[in-house]
């Protein structure tokens, strides 16, 4: 099964997450199929908090990929930001 989930990057006390498509059997920071965007929970100033390719997420969900709970919330937020812009 394929999932869209977060993989951690960044430094200690300064997390940064990539939003990726991966097989559920892969490790958190292991092999991925495609990188769809990123999430920066500690963004400051003009830095974007979420950058996500909504069209590619829709493509993967249409092909049977499942979103994790956190990615689902980020997807909704990115979609509403795109509609507002």
UniProtKB/Swiss-Prot annotation:
Any one Pfam family here would be Ribosomal_S16
GO terms under biological process: translation
In the record, what terms sit under GO molecular function?
A: structural constituent of ribosome
Q: What is the protein's name according to its record?
A: Small ribosomal subunit protein bS16
Q: Which NCBIfam families match?
A: S16
**What's this protein's family per the entry?**
Belongs to the bacterial ribosomal protein bS16 family.
Residue ranges of the TM segments: none
Source species: Xanthomonas euvesicatoria pv. vesicatoria (strain 85-10) (Xanthomonas campestris pv. vesicatoria)
Q: Pull one GO CC term from this UniProt entry.
A: small ribosomal subunit
Q: List the InterPro entries.
A: Ribosomal_bS16, Ribosomal_bS16_CS, Ribosomal_bS16_dom_sf
Keywords of the record: Ribonucleoprotein, Ribosomal protein
